[in-house]
Amino acid sequence: IAYQSGSNAKIYNPVEYKGTVKVNGEIKDVSRKVYQQNDIDFNYFDETTGLTNLERMQAGKPPIGSDGNPIQLHHILQKEVGPMVEIREITHQEYYSQLHGVIEDGASFRNNPVLNKQYNNFRCSYWKWRAEQIIGGN
């Protein structure tokens, strides 16, 4: 996925995340495609937490984006499990209607306690995995 923004191109690299999480004692497969931003500054120092972006990710937290806010993981099809994209919080807010208009009101997976917990567990695991990919050079 790529889009042009003035003379700068933002490129998202598609990767296959393979993994499982435990939800209420049951193992769930949370493998999916994730479109990763390639412009995250992993050395950025977050004064609030005292951690670099890479250290935040190693702790299961999202890195801070160029807008000064944590990077969001957006469900492209609004389904858990489903493909995701890393986007800036400001983009997530600015295009909220367009990004979330694919499902009816009240139909969000977040209304299902098991799926919501599954996603929250995935999110923490994903950022740790993403940090390992950076450290390992993959």
Positions of the model-derived regions?
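Catalytic toxin/effector domains delivered as secreted proteins or via bacterial secretion systems
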Residues: 3-138
